[in-house]
């Protein structure tokens, strides 16, 4: 059965050729803009403080206020992503942090990542998954002749207890669906990756 062996090699070569082709295809500006528009369609009503269609009114008031509703990303002070290099950090202690971009083509920003920390002044020193995604995102924007306008914002009015703070982080992720959080990455079919 020498024929089946040859077919296997032929099939294997075809797969390798196909993967080389997809690696060499550049990201088009229109693809990136469309990706931003899809994310914006979900997040813009939240930035405008409009209720989500999926949120239903609690007729009996038993649910209580969701602490995630109280966090308005635009009310928080924007900082450069390299804030951690400054001689003195503007924040310390427990915090929830939000990474945003402000595309010129859209009427609202994009919330790209939500995180939590017990040490706001030290969290971004060293390795962080989000840094790699932001670098890939910034590079993709530049290759498409678009300008990134990234910022990070800290909310320090959060629970000190790690479990409660992580629960708040998860509520924010479920609400905003930021594309760089692992919980929601697949939803947005991100057209760029941090892998080389």
Predicted feature locations:
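Amphipathic alpha-helical interaction segments
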Residues: 19, 43, 132-133, 141, ...
